[in-house]
Amino acid sequence: RWIAPHPGRPHERPFYFDTGPSLITLPFVFEETFAAAGRKLSDYLTLTRLDPIQKYIWADGTTLSGRAMPADLAAELARFTQQPDEVAAFQRILAKGKMIWDESAELFLYHAPEQVLKGDGKFDPRRALSMLTIPIKIGMFANFAKWINREVSHPRLREVLYQYATYSGASPFMAPATLLVIPFAEYHFGGWYIPGGLYSLA
């Protein structure tokens, strides 16, 4: 019944539910895909930037909003944790994610491995040797939860960060620290929504 393999949209009239991705974090990927086909994304879809990107609610009524702007996010984290050190810790996690992005995006996002090996595309093959150290730099052999726990002590803020591993179906206690790139990408590039739900993209 559904066109796309991952996003689904079951419904209980009159409500529809996205069962796959709930937001877009790299809108430029879709813009470039449409451009490669000679089309403009904006002619087909309207992307709306979310603020907050998400809202966390605990059983006791405690809430945390993932605000889109850095200053607003810092203020919300300060309110939530009541600990300035925890705000700084969260920012260090995002900085780690940025480092992972900077080190790996060119190789893993912008170029397929076979392009690198064949010298295709814009990738500079002279950088290939230096990239042998990338797996260590980006935390491929480090543990996601342990890295978070080393920086963050607030138990619920840890929970918030743990759930980024579950985006890919992984356990935060078994996943590599490389997945810290996910919260960075979400807050740096923003969370975006398509009116009507992400199934509209399919």
PLM ranges: what are they?
Residues 1:
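N-terminal Rossmann-like FAD-binding beta1-loop-alpha1 element of flavoenzymes
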Residues 4, 11, 58:
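Acidic surface patches and DE-rich sequence motifs
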Residues 7-53:
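N-terminal FAD cofactor-binding segment of flavoenzymes
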Residues 12-16, 167-169, 190-192:
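A short glycine/serine-rich beta->alpha loop
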Residues 26, 140, 197-201:
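Short, glycine/acidic-rich beta->alpha junctions
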Residues 43, 172-177, 181:
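Active-site substrate-recognition segment that forms the wall
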Residues 56-176:
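Rossmann-like flavin
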